[in-house]
Amino acid sequence: MRPIRRAFAIAVLCVAALLPVDSSAAGAGKASIETFVTRAIRPVMERYGVPGMAVGIIVKGQTYVYDYGVASTATGRPVTSSTLFEIGSVSKTFTATLAAYARTGGALSLSDMASEHLRSLRGSSFDEVSLLDLGTHMSGLPLQVPDNITNNAQLMEYLRSWKPEHAPGTYRTYSNLGIGLLGMIAASTMHGDFAALMQDRVFSGLGMQHTYFGVPETEWDNYAQGYTATNIPIRMVPGVLAPEAYGIKTTAGDMLRFIAANMGMLDINERLQHAIAGTHAGYDRIGSMTQDLIWEQYDDRVGLKELREGNSDRMLLQANPATRLDPAAPPRDHVLIDKTGSTNGFSTYVAFIPAKKTGIVILANKRYPNDARVTAAYAILTRLDDDASKD
């Protein structure tokens, strides 16, 4: 297993600095970093016909964004620092953050049973499903909300009769419903609307000024057109639990602020920082992957093979036996934490290593395989480490 060593890459193309940048170093490193990022990204765009991508990197306290291609093939509008992408299931990490925020305020405990907060589910299977199960894909709930469910009343009716195939807490089954219910419960315990609470407590708290559930009219021109794997133009259609599970649109720059906060690099509200750190505790073990509160965690010396397996279709679409950690593993710095996200027309990958203050986000306006995202990101992170050994 090849180690990912500490990255000391020379600062280049500074788009939004977290710390002061050395201009001479920036000039010296520009060709090297921009070249290897492009070499990792261009083949992916060509192979899968991706119209546009934005790649954000954090190295040594500096953030950089590289834009490629177009936001729309119809207009030829280029991807820029203002381009908004759908981030799919990476939205779940924000929902986990809001739930952790509610927890730090004493509004809920992860050991609570879901039916304690959703009265209509009392006497159902949710008497045995904890909030922790919902936030770690260990409830047994299916991946998608059934197509015939169009409102919360229908959702509750469906859930009242639902029965898990395995005992909660024993198998990992990736689920939009699980995190959706956790978000619903978190908002209820905070006596507010989910989207409004997220905007007020999380987005604003992190200084994410270009992150939305519903894209405002003033930003519509910045909203990238998405494309399916077969090149059909598409954007996300709102649905039940969509905001909680996959509904966020944002920029590469805003995502870098979120990654930076997850590595303790921003000066933010203490309660919010504590909540973010709480999402990095490890609760379940599946192969080489430790399941955090939505985030997925690996040793920071993880190899590409293990990282690809952890982000494979098997992990997404099948029930995988898991070992619950008791007690939970506390948050650690010497780990690689990641998450993929997709809608029908967009693809996202986020990975960061807290001990190295190094991270990456890849945003694309086309659906393409997780494997290609992980491989490209790993190549970039590894190259940063290779440069570190020469610094």
Go through each PLM region and give its residues.
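Bacterial N-terminal signal peptides that target proteins for export
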Residues: M1-A9
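Bacterial N-terminal signal peptides
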Residues: A9-L18
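Boundary at the C-terminal end of the N-terminal hydrophobic targeting segment
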Residues: S23-A28
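Short, conserved catalytic-motif segment at the N-terminal edge
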Residues: K30-F85, A107-D112, E116, A153-E157, ...
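Short active-site loop at a secondary-structure junction
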Residues: E46-A54, A74-D133, P164-G178, P243-Y246, ...
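Short, surface-exposed loop or secondary-structure junction motifs
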Residues: V65-Y68, S72, S124-S342
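Short, gly/Ser/Thr-rich active-site loops of penicillin-recognizing serine hydrolases
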Residues: S288-M289, D300, R367-D391
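Short, well-ordered beta-strand elements
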Residues: K339, S347-F352, K356-K366
